[in-house]
C-alpha cells in the first residue's frame, strides 16, 4: 500500500526518542494502563515522529457505571472518543496525522486483546485510520513492545514490523 494512510498497513519506523517517551509513560502509569497517540509527517507515511499522552478514562467510566464498564485502568484503557475525533482532525489539518494509538498492558504480554479488537474494529471496518502499539510492563519492568495492524475486511489484527531509528 502506498500513498494516503498507508501506515494502517504497518511496517513503521519510530524515532528512538518517541519510543522512549512511550515506554516512560507506560512505566509512570504502572500498575495502570497508559494510552496516547503517535503522529508523523503526512509526507512520510511510515515515519512516527511525535507522541502525545492521553488520559485513560477507564476509572472515570467505571466509577460512573460499573455494570457497563466493569474494568478499571488496571486492565483496560478508554480514550474519550470526542476528544480523539478532534485530535485526529487537528492532526490531519496540521499535516502530521495520528498514525498509531498506543497503550500498555500491565503484567500481561504485548498482544492485541479481544477487547482491543472489539473496540477498534466492527463489521470488518477499522474505527480509526491508524495502527496500534502495545507495550508490556511486567512487575514494573518493560517487557515487550509490538505493533499491530488491522486485517482489512475482518475484525482481526496481526503483528507488523516496527523499526526503531
Cite the ranges covered by each PLM segment.
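Conserved beta-strand-loop surface patch within small alpha/beta domains used
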Residues: 1-98, 107-165
Amino acid at each position: 500500500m502506498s500513498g494516503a494512510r498507508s501506515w494502517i498497513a504497518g511496517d513503521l519506523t519510530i524515532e528512538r526518542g518517541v519510543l522512549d517517551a512511550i515506554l516512560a509513560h507506560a512505566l509512570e502509569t504502572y500498575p495502570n494502563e497508559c494510552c496516547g497517540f503517535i503522529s508523523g509527517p503526512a509526507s512520510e507515511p511510515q515515519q512516527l515522529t511525535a507522541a502525545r499522552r492521553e488520559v485513560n478514562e477507564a476509572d472515570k467510566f467505571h466509577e460512573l457505571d460499573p455494570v457497563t464498564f466493569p474494568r478499571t485502568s488496571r486492565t483496560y484503557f478508554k480514550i474519550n472518543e470526542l476528544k480523539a475525533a478532534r485530535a485526529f482532525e487537528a492532526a490531519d489539518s496540521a499535516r502530521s496525522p495520528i498514525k498509531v494509538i498506543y497503550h500498555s498492558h500491565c503484567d500481561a504480554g504485548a498482544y492485541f486483546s479481544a477487547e482491543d479488537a472489539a473496540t477498534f474494529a466492527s463489521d470488518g471496518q477499522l474505527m480509526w485510520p491508524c495502527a496500534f502499539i502495545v507495550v508490556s510492563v511486567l512487575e514494573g519492568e518493560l517487557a515487550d513492545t509490538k505493533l499491530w495492524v488491522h486485517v482489512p475486511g475482518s475484525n482481526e489484527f496481526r503483528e507488523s514490523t516496527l523499526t526503531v531509528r
